[in-house]
Amino acid sequence: MEISALLERHRHSRQQIGKRLLEFREFSSKQVMWTYEQDEIKLVPSSCKHDERLFEELAFCILAANTSAEMGMKTVDRLRKMLHHASPKQMTTAIKGVYRFINLRPQYIVHSRTYLQQLDVPFHELLRSFEDKQELRDFLANNAGIKGIGYKEASHFLRNVGIGGFAILDKHIVKSMHEFGITPTSKPPSSRRQYLELEQRYVEWAESLGISPEELDLLLWSRKTGKILK
């Protein structure tokens, strides 16, 4: 696909992309949650506490890694009633036939849940305590208490709770960068240094197109799936 065709796709999908980005910001300010309904990921009203909704989103990012946003969302829906108290074994039983990594990811979720529950500060206050969002991402990606979250997943989580400006450098995005001649290789980054270097190229590419990093991510994914995901 030529750059001109990519920009034309953006022109046609700009309204949908803008709506999804607004929903990411609304997630932190309104009583809402994500769900998979009628073959679509939707934002719907929720009675859950703020920290419960934030942890749901963290679990989603753990589950979506190396699978898909839709599989991750369907699995969160299956786990929602037990996410805050169930054992890994109970979660594994619940997601058989729905999810791919039925043993390891529940362990990551429970490990992270236990760590966050033992902190002296609520999850939402912990996130707000970082004045520098780069330091916040470093904390999430490098913290042994939070399993299944690296730089890609931390960037995904922060974007989805309204903290933008990062690149979510999964294999599809990196492959797209290579296809458009932005990088010499389609190999995903394997260290913090590589991630930051590739992220800088991504951000500069978005700026050259006249769109935000968040818009470009959703645009590239819509090119692959035909949908505006999360």
Regions found by a protein language model. Give the residues of each.
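C-terminal accessory module of base-excision DNA glycosylases/AP lyases that mediates lesion recognition
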Residues: 1-41, 106, 121-138, 145-230
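Structure-specific DNA junction-binding interface
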Residues: 1-98
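Non-catalytic, well-ordered alpha-helical scaffold segments
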Residues: 53-61, 73, 77, 103-110, ...
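Short, hydrophobic/amphipathic alpha-helical patches that form generic packing surfaces
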Residues: 57-66, 110-114, 159, 217-225
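Short amphipathic alpha-helical interaction patches enriched in hydrophobic/aromatic residues
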Residues: 62, 95, 99, 161, ...
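Short alpha-helix boundary/capping elements
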Residues: 63-71, 83-84, 117, 165, ...
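Alpha-helical ds-nucleic-acid-binding substructure associated with the helix-hairpin-helix region
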Residues: 76-147
